[in-house]
């Protein structure tokens, strides 16, 4: 990071109680969390029942509304990836949460794989996808140029070592493949 101009200080009230800074990266023009949590400890920050994308619970009105909106979103995401013609239809969803997008894609003839660092969410996702969701370390074990589509739905901003991850994903994407990033 070239310039460490503090944009905002924020506290993680949900899990760790730690205070972080959002630092403007002058080189790339976006905000970064500082200090970055260590990659091997990153999943600890999502170990809470209140982190809604890692659970299928519908305990209250907010969670019920989330599932309604998620179902609408899943249909739109599927329509989007289906608009990119591909013979093999191989999809990698990074940060797949509980695997709902993978399940919908799988039901629509996509060969799916997912990456999810949170163990609880990964277990739920594996139940939905016939064990096609793996830990982050698996990224380096996939065959080069093996995916037609790689998606990061609201995950990009959570990735540590951004350049390294982008390089890995680029190598996994087929030559005419598509990378979807939503932040």
PLM regions and their residue ranges:
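Alpha-helix initiation/capping motif
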Residues: 14, 35, 66-70, 140
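Short, solvent-exposed coil/turn linker segments
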Residues: 3, 47-48, 70, 132-138
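Residues that form generic nucleotide/phosphate-binding pockets
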Residues: 45, 68, 72, 84
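N-terminal juxtadomain amphipathic helix
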Residues: 1-60
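Conserved SAM-binding loop and adjacent beta-strand
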Residues: 62-76
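Conserved SAM-binding loop
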Residues: 76-183
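Charge-dense, low-complexity intrinsically disordered segments
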Residues: 19, 64, 68, 156
């Amino acid at each position: 990071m070239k310039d460490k101009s503090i944009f905002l200080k924020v506290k993680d009230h949900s899990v760790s109680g730690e205070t972080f800074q959002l630092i403007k990266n002058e080189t790339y023009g976006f905000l970064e969390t500082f200090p970055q949590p260590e990659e091997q400890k990153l999943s600890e920050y999502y170990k809470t029942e209140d982190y809604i994308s890692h659970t299928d619970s519908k305990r209250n009105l907010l969670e019920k509304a989330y599932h309604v909106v998620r179902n609408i979103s899943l249909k739109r995401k599927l329509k989007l990836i289906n608009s990119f013609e591909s013979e093999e239809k191989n999809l990698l969803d990074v940060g797949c949460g509980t695997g709902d997008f993978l399940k919908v894609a799988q039901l629509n003839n996509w060969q799916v794989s997912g990456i999810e660092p949170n163990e609880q969410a990964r277990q739920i996702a594996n139940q939905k996808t016939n064990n096609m969701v793996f830990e982050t370390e698996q990224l380096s074990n996939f065959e080069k140029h093996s995916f037609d589509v790689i998606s990061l739905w609201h995950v990009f901003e959570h990735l540590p070592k951004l350049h390294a991850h982008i390089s890995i994903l680029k190598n996994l994407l087929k030559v005419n493949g598509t990378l979807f990033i939503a932040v």
